[in-house]
Amino acid sequence: MKKVGVIPNINKDKDLEVTKSVVNWLLDHGSEPYLNEIVAARIGYEKHGKKANEIYSKSDFLIALGGDGTILNVARLCAPFGTPILAVNLGHLGFLTEIDASELFPSLEKIYKGEYAIEKRMMLEANVVKNDMEVINFRALNDIVITRGAFSRMARIKAYVNDNYVDTYLADGVIVATPTGSTAYSLSAGGPIVYPTVEVIIITPICPHTLYSRSIVVSPDDVIRLEIAEENQDLMITTDGQQGYKIDYRDVIYIKKSNEYTNLIKVKNSNFFDLLRDKLTER
């Protein structure tokens, strides 16, 4: 029996009709759906309610119903377990969602027949060190960003790669992105577009004060060190635009490739460049 985690974005599937139809399909095909306990109660399937950790760790695969933001959140939570994700779009066209809701059930039929592939996406790991002690760590599928607040002055951030000094960025912040994240915030800040399955790390200053400060692409084996080089009352580190932590003068952030990957289920012969053209036309 397949155990399948169903994770809806309740802001996009407000009445949970899509979620309920997925659960019914899974039950009809002899599978056991795993649901958040609150969601399970709302649709009358309390016995299928599970704790979050059990959903991510024990499911054979996950169905994420939402948009790119939903996928980013699910990716971080299930990465330690390597659980594959079928990303279903319930909103605007995204870079991460594999299918639309109208394609969901034919896609599930393909998965149950073994007609799918797994695409591995590189992730990042960040560690914040304060007074020589690690205080928090993050993982990200898209990017790790250091940014200033709305009313604070420019940040001064020293960047090193493998202890080799790169530059001191006087800027609104710095983005460290994966290839998956190269089409997100990094692209808006002038960074390069990188094919999503290539493994590199992209460093992009945000609105730098000096014209020569440009994006740098480094090896996935490199370790990036960012040092907060000046007092600034309002600096934050954020991961995938969803988690945040306040950082201060003399804090040090180490960023490297994570040992964990996001495993995306692919059921279509989709073309990244077709998707890229569609998204850039939207912009």
Swiss-Prot record:
Membrane spanning stretches: none
EC number: 2.7.1.23
Protein name (Swiss-Prot/TrEMBL): NAD kinase
A Gene Ontology biological process term: NAD metabolic process
Co-factor requirement: a divalent metal cation
Class in the EC hierarchy, top level: transferase
Keyword Transferase: yes
GO molecular function annotation: ATP binding; metal ion binding; NAD binding; NAD+ kinase activity
A GO term from the CC aspect: cytoplasm
Function per UniProt: Involved in the regulation of the intracellular balance of NAD and NADP, and is a key enzyme in the biosynthesis of NADP. Catalyzes specifically the phosphorylation on 2'-hydroxyl of the adenosine moiety of NAD to yield NADP.
Catalytic activity: NAD(+) + ATP = ADP + NADP(+) + H(+)
Keywords from the UniProt entry: ATP-binding, Cytoplasm, Kinase, NAD, NADP, Nucleotide-binding, Transferase
Originating organism: Caldanaerobacter subterraneus subsp. tengcongensis (strain DSM 15242 / JCM 11007 / NBRC 100824 / MB4) (Thermoanaerobacter tengcongensis)
PANTHER family xref list: NAD KINASE
HAMAP family: NAD_kinase
Family label: Belongs to the NAD kinase family.
Binding site residues for NAD(+): 68-69, 142-143, 153, 172, 183-188, 242
